UniProtKB/Swiss-Prot annotation:
Organism for this UniProt entry: Thermotoga maritima (strain ATCC 43589 / DSM 3109 / JCM 10099 / NBRC 100826 / MSB8)
InterPro entries xref list: Ribosomal_bL33, Ribosomal_bL33_CS, Ribosomal_bL33_sf, Ribosomal_zn-bd
Family per record: Belongs to the bacterial ribosomal protein bL33 family.
Protein encoded by which gene: rpmG
Name of this protein: Large ribosomal subunit protein bL33
Domain of life (superkingdom): Bacteria
GO biological process: translation
Matches recorded under NCBIfam families: PRK00504.1 (NF001764), PRK00595.1 (NF001860), rpmG_bact (TIGR01023)
Amino acid sequence: MRVKVALKCSQCGNKNYYTTRNKDKRAKLELRKYCPKCNAHTIHTETKA
């Protein structure tokens, strides 16, 4: 089953992206994405949507 999650910037805390992930995986998603508030590519971590 897939669940909706938000990706939050690790520097400013802004929720910039929403995606889905497999619920069976235990580790949190960590992706390097662009943050418009920071104006840079930063690590975004998974949070509840």
